């Protein structure tokens, strides 16, 4: 089972949670008691069923995760009580922040509704076909890297690798990319020139490598990289369902850009700043 932190970071939602016949009390505190159903109901929107997993009841979680859930739930209740006893919600600063938050939430809801109502089946199909055409015949590679601060450090790591050093162990020891270091520096699969992936300098060097080949140090805005290609294979063509999130995001970005542009035009927006290439006084 995935770690609790992974479950909470997911944006997927359970459609329903089935509770057992017995709604057990799992904790008590001065303010009352906590039941399994309360925990599951509280965190239901944040739970995610990973592939092959079935989380229907509180008992499906490992004991250590059950304890974490209970503590988070009770701590939220205790903090809520502390807020109620304080005067924080009546302060001017809080009210201003609350109003700003409400405005932001309202804008997000407005945009979400506008985007949803303007994505048609034809738009989706056209964008999907364009997306698939762009993937046909392309290759994807599985890459790992070791990120360090300076060229000197990169050369040191490269020398260790040249002398038979283990890439996985060196990534764990030296890499500044903590998100991948613990997994041997593995980033995953990338496709050349695919928007939203990696910086061009990294991609160009990576795609020039053979499988199991290690690069010379590569400089990017993040630092210095030692790159290793672990695998190469053709890019699989996703079904419409598999590509739905990607296509929806592409269409949403296009619709949003046009919507904002139209609003600016209707408002007759004129920026009064000097041109970017204009000369300023010395």
Swiss-Prot record:
InterPro entries: PPIase_dom_sf, PPIase_PpiC, PrsA_foldase
EC number: 5.2.1.8
UniProt signal peptide: 1-20
Domain PpiC: 138-231
Location within or outside the cell: Cell outer membrane
Domain of life where this protein originates: Bacteria
PANTHER family the UniProt entry points to: PEPTIDYL-PROLYL CIS-TRANS ISOMERASE HP_0175-RELATED, PEPTIDYLPROLYL ISOMERASE
Family the UniProt entry places it in: Belongs to the PpiC/parvulin rotamase family.
PROSITE patterns: PPIC_PPIASE_2 (PS50198)
Protein name: Parvulin-like PPIase
UniProt keyword list: Cell outer membrane, Isomerase, Membrane, Rotamase, Signal
SUPFAM superfamilies recorded: FKBP-like
Molecular function terms, GO-annotated: peptidyl-prolyl cis-trans isomerase activity
Enzymatic reactions: [protein]-peptidylproline (omega=180) = [protein]-peptidylproline (omega=0)
A GO CC annotation given for this chain: cell outer membrane
């Amino acid at each position: 089972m995935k770690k609790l932190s992974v479950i909470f970071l997911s944006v997927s939602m359970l459609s329903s949670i089935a509770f057992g016949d017995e709604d057990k009390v799992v904790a008590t505190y001065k303010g009352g008691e906590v039941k399994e159903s309360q925990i599951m109901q509280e965190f239901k929107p944040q739970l995610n069923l990973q592939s092959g997993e079935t989380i229907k009841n509180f008992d499906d979680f490992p004991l250590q995760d059950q304890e974490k859930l209970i503590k988070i739930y009770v701590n939220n209740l205790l903090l809520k009580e502390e807020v109620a006893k304080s005067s924080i919600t009546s302060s001017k600063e809080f009210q201003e922040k609350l109003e700003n938050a409400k405005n932001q939430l309202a804008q997000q809801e407005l945009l979400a509704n506008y985007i949803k109502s303007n994505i048609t089946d034809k738009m989706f199909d056209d964008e999907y076909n364009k997306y698939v055409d762009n993937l046909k015949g392309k290759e994807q590679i599985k890459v790992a890297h070791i990120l360090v601060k300076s060229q000197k450090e990169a050369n040191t790591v490269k020398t260790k690798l040249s002398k038979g050093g283990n890439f996985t162990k060196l990534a764990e020891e030296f890499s500044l990319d903590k998100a991948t270091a613990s997994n041997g520096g593995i980033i995953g699969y990338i496709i050349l020139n695919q928007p939203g992936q990696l910086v061009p300098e990294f991609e160009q060097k990576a795609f020039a490598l053979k499988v199991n080949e290690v690069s010379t140090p590569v400089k990017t805005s993040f630092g210095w990289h030692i790159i290793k290609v672990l695998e190469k294979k053709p890019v699989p063509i996703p079904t419409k369902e598999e590509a739905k999130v990607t296509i929806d995001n592409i269409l949403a970005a296009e619709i949003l850009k046009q919507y904002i542009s139209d609003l600016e035009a209707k408002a007759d927006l004129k920026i009064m700043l000097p041109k970017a290439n204009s000369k300023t006084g010395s």
